[in-house]
Amino acid sequence: MLFRSQYPEIKKNAEALGARVVWNPHPEEGISSSMKLGLLEVIKEKPQAQSFSASRENNACLFLVADQPWIRCHTIEALIRMYTESEKGMAAAAKNGQPGNPCIFSGKYYPELLALTGDTGGKRVMRKYMQDVALLEVPDKKELTDMDIPPDIS
C-alpha cells in the first residue's frame, strides 16, 4: 500500500491490517511519483519483476486508488479474471469505453510506467497501446467515482 496522507492514523490502521506501507515523501510531484514508488517496491520485493519479459501471469501489477470507496470486490475479481484470461498486456475498469482505475499492467509495461513524470498516470500508457488493453465495462458507474473532496460523497 502506498501511503500519501497527512493523517498518520491511516498509516497506523493500514499496518495493523497487515498492509505493507510505502510513504510518498513528494506527493506534489504528481500521480507518477506514487505509481513509481509502488512499482519500485514491487520490483524490490520480487526481483524477477525486473525481468520485464517474464510471463504476464507471474509479472503484473494491480493499481487501485483509495478514493473509489464504492468499488466492489466482485469488480476487482472480474478485472483480474479478465486480465488472466485475455492475451492482453493491460486490463482496466472502464466507464463508457474509457480506461480508468483499477487497472493491471504486465511487466512488459514497467519501463514506460517508470518513465512517467508529473501528474501523469498509467492512462497515458494505456492510450498509447489501446489494442493491448482489455476493458471491463463496469455497469454501476458509481463504483468508479473518485471522491476527492467532501461534496463528492453525496
Predicted segments, located by residue:
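Nucleotide and nucleotide-moiety/phosphate-recognizing core
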Residues: 1-66, 70-99, 129-140
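Glycine- and other small-residue-rich loops at beta-strand/loop junctions that grip anionic moieties
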Residues: 3, 93, 102, 114, ...
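A conserved catalytic-core signature of glycosyltransferases
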Residues: 99-100, 121
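Conserved alpha/beta core of the MobA/IspD/sugar-nucleotide pyrophosphorylase nucleotidyltransferase superfamily
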Residues: 111, 115-154
